[in-house]
């Protein structure tokens, strides 16, 4: 007897023709690994980083990313600084905050500092997927 697929998104992949790179910056190892695995399962090219310094290094040395998914509180700085630096460097990216800071004032600060979306921890994977698919549609229409 076949076992049912336990994945919350069986057989779902990004839109055809869209090859999006995602930088995941999260200091909590388990969270980073789960997000990285989920995004890769969905078919995205993922570059994980565990700190502000590591995230900035990846932005500088790796191929351009389409999406930054970052925690706000990092051991050596903030996701605000990461997105701010990406924007200063002229990077046109979709920036998604993933944080335990969920008060309306926290969401407002994230928006004012350059984030396009703010997701609370634990992450609503359905909502994250919808955001990424919207970006994929936009990328597909722009090409």
Positions of PLM-derived features:
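Non-catalytic signal-transmission and effector/linker regions of two-component phosphorelay proteins
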Residues: 1-23, 36, 124-143
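Conserved acidic carboxylate
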Residues: 26
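Acidic, metal-coordinating helix/loop segments flanking the phosphotransfer/catalytic sites
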Residues: 48-67
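Acidic catalytic/metal-coordinating carboxylates
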Residues: 51, 78-81
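Active-site residues of response regulator receiver
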Residues: 71, 99
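Short amphipathic alpha-helix used as the core "switch/output" element in two-component signaling
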Residues: 80-92
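Alpha4 helix (beta4-alpha4-beta5 surface) of REC/receiver domains from two-component response regulators
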Residues: 81, 102-119, 130
């Amino acid at each position: 007897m076949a076992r049912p697929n336990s994945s919350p998104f069986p057989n779902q992949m990004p839109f055809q023709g869209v090859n999006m790179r995602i930088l995941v910056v999260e200091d909590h190892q388990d969270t980073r690994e789960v997000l990285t695995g989920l995004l890769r399962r969905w078919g995205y090219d993922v570059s994980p980083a565990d700190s502000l310094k590591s995230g900035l290094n990846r932005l500088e040395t790796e191929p351009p990313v389409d999406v930054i998914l970052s925690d706000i509180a990092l051991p050596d700085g903030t996701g605000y600084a990461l997105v701010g630096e990406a924007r200063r460097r002229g990077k046109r990216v979709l920036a998604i905050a993933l944080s335990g800071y969920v008060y309306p004032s926290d969401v407002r600060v994230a928006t004012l500092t350059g984030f396009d979306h703010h997701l609370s921890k634990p992450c609503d994977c359905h909502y994250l997927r919808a955001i990424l698919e919207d970006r994929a549609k936009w990328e597909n229409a722009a090409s």
